[in-house]
Amino acid sequence: MATRAATKMAGKKEHQYCLLDTQEKRHGHYPFSFELKPYGQTGANIIGVQGSLTHVVKMTVFPFMIPFPLQKTRIGDFIGGRVYLFFKELDMQAFSDVNGMQYHFEFKVVPVSSSQVELLPVNNTYKFTYAIPELQYLTPIFYDLSGPLDFPLDTLSVHVDSLTHHIHLPIQNHNLTMGDRVFVSGYKHLQTIETCKNNIIFIKDIPPLSSEKINLYIPKNRIRIPLYFKSLKASK
């Protein structure tokens, strides 16, 4: 008589690479948050993964760049030369520092330029005591010993005057300066800022645009967090 084997958690492992890109963050969420869905599901503001992130037992992070936080102006402003990364959805399992703040990864801060630093993991792997049943969202929170860190925006919704080549910036926390490169939606060419003052910037050779309101992307403010997950999968 044929019998059907029961489904159980076995030693079979699945490895998935995931890149959290701030230009794919969920709209209206602050701090920035990401929705994780299999590649077969399409839609705006979705980070595609190979399959469902279930039964996660290990998470690995690799070095990546961040812009200077709004609270910092020089490398010496990072207390202890360290930055910590915490994922809100994983708060039941995390390290705690002497002040009781939770984190999953600790990084050494290395200066790269006047506007960016590189984060080098002190220990790049976090092993979960209990497997995480499912991961659908990830909300990374950065902080140092002075508290949470906020970052300049990498995407701005702006108004443009195509005749005068003026773009009016609606907010201040963009940290754009003369010579910075930006990307204007609808025009596939890296533009260079000519001047920037009084909350108006001047772009070289900007073409006529179909709409006065466009998106302006700022590469130096973009954050991409490379993560690697190991999951235990059910076998029959």
From Swiss-Prot:
Subcellular location field: Virion
Keywords, in A-Z order: Late protein, Virion
Listed GO CC annotations: virion component
Keyword S-adenosyl-L-methionine on entry: no
Domain of life per record: Viruses
Induction entry: Expressed in the late phase of the viral replicative cycle.
Biological role stated in the UniProt entry: Forms the penton at the fivefold vertices of the icosahedral capsid. Together with the minor capsid proteins (p17, p49, and M1249L), forms a complicated network immediately below the outer capsid shell, stabilizing the whole capsid.
Family statement: Belongs to the asfivirus H240R family.
Protein name, entry field: Penton protein H240R
Organism of this sequence: African swine fever virus (isolate Pig/Kenya/KEN-50/1950) (ASFV)
